[in-house]
UniProtKB/Swiss-Prot annotation:
Gene3D superfamilies: 3.90.320.10, P-loop containing nucleotide triphosphate hydrolases. This is ATP-dependent helicase/deoxyribonuclease subunit B. One of its GO terms (molecular function) is ATP binding. Its EC number is 3.1.-.-. Keywords: ATP-binding, DNA damage, DNA repair, DNA-binding, Exonuclease, Helicase, Hydrolase, Nuclease, Nucleotide-binding. Belongs to the helicase family. AddB/RexB type 2 subfamily. Pfam families: ADDB_N (PF21445), PDDEXK_1 (PF12705). It comes from Streptococcus pyogenes serotype M2 (strain MGAS10270). The heterodimer acts as both an ATP-dependent DNA helicase and an ATP-dependent, dual-direction single-stranded exonuclease. Recognizes the chi site generating a DNA molecule suitable for the initiation of homologous recombination. This subunit has 5' -> 3' nuclease activity but not helicase activity. InterPro entries: ADDB_N, DNA_helicase_suRexB, P-loop_NTPase, PDDEXK-like_dom_sf, PDDEXK_AddAB-type, Restrct_endonuc-II-like. It comes from the Bacteria. Heterodimer of AddA and RexB. Its cofactor is Mg(2+).
Length: 1071
């Protein structure tokens, strides 16, 4: 064995490549071994250093891959074990054990996390060259007994199913020990680069290779100063020193110092020496030179997005200077925090990249499909799961529009559970859903699922066959091929599909002869899919490499950007969370010689120093170290390592926000520039965070309050949300000439509430999602229907009998049966409505001097100027003198207010009066009024009554009165009825004024509507708060910012309010 060490300023790879070339020139076969995470980059670096740029004599690979070169022909043809297969084997082993067989772990038999921990422990045992019987000295002896039962049973299953229990390195070591490879190894030289420690498995193999190979050469970075130190605790080279010293002691050799022809920039060497001096308690009498600082940059950004954008701009600048993507390496402090953001931002700047991390399959549509399938079976056809299956794009041949229509209907009809999905869809609404089409679609979905889900407990092989048949019926493979939109997606889908078929194969092999329920089968496949990962190789080598910073090696690339280096992530603190604690691992290691567990937490300090040293020397030209103030929505501090660099004299540059400038980095890329311009166009919306907006909104409110006390006024913000008018073509389609514009009292109210709301409801015809479950609209229909039946009943039956009959027959209508007999909640609502009917009905019995002459009367009122007002009058009454009036049923309290009417927010009663005047017989000229009847079950506070007497009854009937507009001429006839006429009497001239002004409101609104320009102007009554519909989710209206856009209502003092508003109406309606 030969041990080599060198300073950080030299290239260890060059030194080892020279050793490999010498061996190859002598006719030896050379294996150049690199760590798993670096083999790809190391191969490229080694080939670059070879003069011939390639050779068959030197193979750059990993330990595991090297073993296959020697054992591929002699290894037994057994099944391969991967993590998913191991998990299935442990699941099967636990199935065969009873809870009482496992005192410590009996309750965790079906826990997926516990099974994952068993897999990890089994792999650790293999790497540590230990068996489960070596787990002595545990905190609880019962743990070892349980683990022995589980693992031995699992190993028995592996033998029965012909799985290879040995790892590739174990098979290689066994072949060497048996002398099967002596001839080959005698002509082999092993070169090992990039290691600072070996696992027990690698350590054992190395001892065998040293005895049988021609030579084993190992290199590591250690300074001569550190090598001569006797005390190395806390030294930045502590990990490498321990590594070399242990090997030297074990194999009785002395490490030699070597140098390379290539010498890296002295700036990095000087920084390394300062870093070393800080940690070995020595001093240097010099500082970094001014030109050294040109090779280092320390950035500080506010949050991750800004940080990544600054890196992307800097990369674009490097390209402008003539460098290639492959010259750049990006290191991440927290891979999980940055992985989702860095891709879209690099795509925006058109930077090709390769993320050096296996991608989890959990977000792939195939995994989502399998998960939805499993949940559909487990939770009895839950609607969300069925829809998620369809939306994955892998179930059947359905268009997106068909799926949207199916989803809309199932939400409306509340279709959930097998019972409802299996029955034909029959319920419909005013939207007239295409039930024939939906039922065909329902059958295409239900039949294959029903066939699969009815499977009883049976052999696993039979379940897999049925699952495959189901997947064929729904055309899963064809749909999977149709998902890909690019070559990269095609490659990803191929990897995912291969993983999926491997999982099915493993399940069939392990559980083929075991009886299982379908739910267990789907759960196992789902767990395997969610935990699986895949990796896609980049199509070109000229890409920016992205990986975790703790996988970096010295002198990796000319330019290195390390981001996310906060105190929480640099250095990293690794802790085990498996079935064995670190203390238990340490006790096991004490009584074993060459076999031992790796205890990461025990090596955190020296490993972090080694990582920091590699990071500071990762670049050969320029190193950028960056830290965000906020990461994962949490404030974090500077890394202690970065603080050391600041003490060395490196300045911390605050990069600030990304503002558009004339720099090449800002305008040099079209796609990035376009996104910047779009962002600036929206600057008024996004320049502050939600937290900042909330803060300044509260401050502004407080400031206005203080100014008001001092009789000062703050100018209203001119910030406005603008809308564009409709094009002439659209106006002609929506409001064609010659066809009257159709309006209603409700539409007019919506228009004056907020013009944009009218545009959404009556121009775009946007509607809220319907539901079969009763809401206020359906409750109102029910109450209207009962009272309509009651008032039509002119028989001599007692009133109470008539009421019972009206309720009974209304309840028997098919629509109300579907709505109110669907569940207990709907039945309770029906009972409440019946109470309201019984409470309100007596008012109809008391008014014996009126006659109901019509109900649910449709009308069309011609307002002139091509305006047609339509509506339905709930009831038309006639007094004994022949005068007519209208009644509008309301499920909530309503009262006519002349101010509200003047502002266009309450035109209903006056509109109905105008319609009644038009449709009334010619011999009837007098109208006695228009009124609301609040359908309610009056609630009284009994505490306010001293005793239960007639006063209580009077209070109940006082709440049940007609409120609205009444004719002063009919005052005497109204006095005997339940009419609240106080402050509600109008003369005939005043009623005519109301009717004229009502017409003016319609004409004014119609004129504006036909122009096709709808403002975002919810109304405000006081100029401080907004009462109109703001539609925040659509318009982004904010009362404090957009008050200038709100429509200010006209308000008058209560004194002479009626007369003043009538005067205003006369002026405006005669303009």
């Amino acid at each position: 064995m030969k041990l080599i060490y060198t300073e950080m300023s030299y290239s260890m790879t060059e030194i080892l490549v020279n050793e490999a070339r010498k061996a190859a020139d002598q006719g030896y076969r050379v294996f150049y071994i690199a760590p798993n995470s670096l083999s790809f980059e190391k191969e490229r670096e080694v080939l670059t250093l070879l003069p011939e740029r390639g050779t068959f004599s030197i193979i750059v690979t990993r330990f595991v891959q090297m073993s296959r070169y020697f054992t591929v022909e002699s290894s037994p043809s057994k099944q391969h074990l991967d993590d998913t297969t191991l998990a299935m084997i442990f699941y099967r082993a636990l199935m065969q054990l009873k809870p009482e067989d496992l005192p410590s772990y009996g309750r965790l038999q079906n826990n997926s996390v516990f099974i994952e921990q068993l897999v990890e422990l089994y792999k650790e045992l293999k790497n540590a060259q230990l068996s489960v019987h070596d787990l002595t000295g545990l905190d609880h002896p019962q743990k070892q007994e349980d683990l022995i039962k589980i693992i031995e049973l699992a190993e028995t299953i592996m033998i029965q199913q012909d799985y290879n229990q040995d790892s590739p390195l174990q098979s290689f070591a066994r072949a060497i020990k048996l002398g099967l490879l002596n001839n080959q190894l005698s002509k082999t030289v092993i070169v090992i680069d990039g290691f600072s420690r070996f696992s027990a498995e690698e350590d054992y193999l190395l001892s065998l290779l040293n005895n049988n190979c021609q030579e084993v050469i190992i290199g590591s970075y250690v300074s001569q100063k550190a090598y001569q130190k006797s005390f190395i605790k806390g030294n930045i080279y502590e990990a490498s020193l321990h590594f070399l010293q242990d090997l030297a002691q074990k194999y009785h050799i002395k490490p030699v110092f070597a140098i390379s022809n290539q010498v890296f920039k002295p700036a990095f060497s000087r920084l390394t020496q300062l870093f070393e001096a800080t940690h070995d308690f020595s001093q240097v009498d010099w500082q970094l030179q001014k030109n050294d600082l040109d090779h280092f940059s320390l950035w500080q950004c506010h949050h991750q997005k800004e940080e990544i954008e600054h890196v992307a701009k800097s990369i674009r600048q490097k390209l402008y200077e003539g460098y290639r993507y492959k010259d750049i390496l990006v290191l991440l402090g927290d891979m999980d925090a940055y992985q989702l953001q860095i891709g879209p931002i690099f795509d925006k700047f058109e930077i090709p990249y390769y993320l050096g991390k296996a991608e989890p399959m959990a977000a792939h549509p195939l995994v989502q499909f399998i998960e939805s399938l499993e949940r559909s079976q487990r939770y009895n056809w839950r609607r969300e799961d069925i829809l998620n299956m369809l939306k994955s794009g892998l179930f059947g041949c359905f268009d997106d529009s068909d799926i949207d229509r199916f989803e809309e209907y199932t939400q409306f009809a509340d279709i959930k559970g097998f019972t409802k999905f299996s029955k034909p869809f029959t319920i419909n609404s005013s939207r007239q859903y295409p039930l024939d089409f939906l039922n065909e679609m329902r059958q295409d979905i239900v039949l294959p699922l029903q066939e699969l889900f009815k499977s009883q407990k049976q052999l696993g092989a039979s379940l897999v066959d049925k699952l495959i048949l189901f997947l064929k019926k729904i055309r899963l493979a064809e749909n999977m091929q149709g998902l890909a939109q690019s070559q990269l997606e095609v490659e990803k889908n191929e990897e995912v599909w291969k993983r999926f078929t491997d999982i099915l194969t493993s399940f069939h092999h392990i559980f083929g002869q075991e009886k299982l329920r379908l739910s267990d089968c789907l759960a196992l496949i789902k767990t395997g899919m969610k935990s699986a990962q895949y990796r896609v190789v980049p199509a070109t080598l000229d890409v920016v490499t992205i990986k975790s910073y703790d996988l970096v090696q010295p002198h990796s690339k000319p330019f290195v950007y390390a981001i996310g280096l906060t105190q929480s992530h640099f250095p990293k603190q690794i802790h085990h969370s498996g079935l064995l604690s670190d203390q238990e691992r340490a006790r096991i290691n004490e009584i074993r010689n060459y076999r031992h567990f790796d205890i990461a937490s025990a090596e955190n300090s020296k490993k972090n120093h080694q990582t920091a040293l590699s990071l500071f020397n990762a670049a050969t030209k320029e190193l950028v170290l960056s830290v965000p103030t906020v990461i994962n929505e949490t404030f974090d501090d500077l890394s202690p390592y970065l603080k050391e660099l600041i003490n060395f004299g490196l300045p911390l540059l605050d990069k600030g926000k990304n503002y558009l400038s004339y720099d090449n980095s800002d305008i040099g890329n079209y796609k990035a520039l376009l996104s910047q311009i779009i962002a600036i166009n929206r600057q008024d919306l996004i320049e502050m965070s939600d937290q900042d907006k909330m803060f300044w909104t509260v401050v502004l409110r407080y400031l206005r309050k203080q100014l008001r006390k001092q009789q000062l006024e703050l100018p209203t913000s001119d910030y406005r949300l603008s809308t564009k008018p409709l094009s002439k073509e659209v106006i002609e389609v929506c409001f064609p000439k010659g066809i009257p514009l159709k309006l209603s009292a409700t539409a007019l109210t919506v228009f004056y509430n907020n013009q944009y709301n009218y545009f959404l409801k009556y121009v775009l015809n946007l509607n809220k999602t319907e539901s079969i479950h009763p809401d206020s609209r359906i409750h109102g229909q029910y109450l209207h229907r009962v009272f309509e039946r009651l008032m039509k009943d002119h028989t001599q039956e007692p009133f109470d009998n008539k009421l019972k009959q009206a309720i009974y027959h209304t309840n028997q209508e098919s629509f109300f049966q579907q709505v109110y007999q669907d569940n207990a909640e709907a039945e309770y609502s029906l009972a409440m409505l019946e109470d309201i009917v019984r409470s309100t009905a007596p008012i109809l019995q008391l008014n014996q001097n009126i006659q109901v002459i019509d109900q649910e009367k449709n009308f069309q009122l011609d307002m002139g100027n091509e305006i047609l007002v339509h509506g339905i009058i709930d009831r038309i009454d006639q007094l004994s003198d022949g005068s007519l009036g209208i009644v509008d049923y309301k499920s909530s309290a309503n009262q006519f207010d002349i101010g509200t009417f003047y502002n266009g927010l309450s035109p209903q009663l006056v509109t109905y009066l105008a319609a009644l005047k038009q449709i009334a017989p010619h011999d009837i000229n007098q109208l006695f009024g228009a009124m609301y009847l609040h359908l309610q079950d009056p609630k009284l506070d009994l505490v306010t009554f001293k005793q239960i007497d007639n006063t209580l009854v009077e209070s109940i009937y006082k709440a049940l009165t007609y409120k609205g507009i009444f004719s002063e001429v009919e005052k005497e006839h109204l006095s005997t009825g339940a009419y609240q006429t106080k402050n509600a009497l109008y003369s005939n001239d005043e009623l005519e004024t109301l009717l004229n002004y009502n017409k003016y409101l319609y004409l004014k609104a119609a004129k504006h509507i036909k122009k096709g320009h709808f403002l975002i102007n919810p109304y405000t009554s006081d100029g401080k708060t907004v009462q109109g519909d703001q539609l925040k989710a659509i318009t982004r209206f904010e009362a404090d910012l957009d008050m200038a856009q709100a429509r200010r209502l006209v308000t008058l003092p209560a004194k002479e309010k009626k007369e003043c508003f009538l005067t205003l109406m006369r002026k405006e309606s005669h303009l």
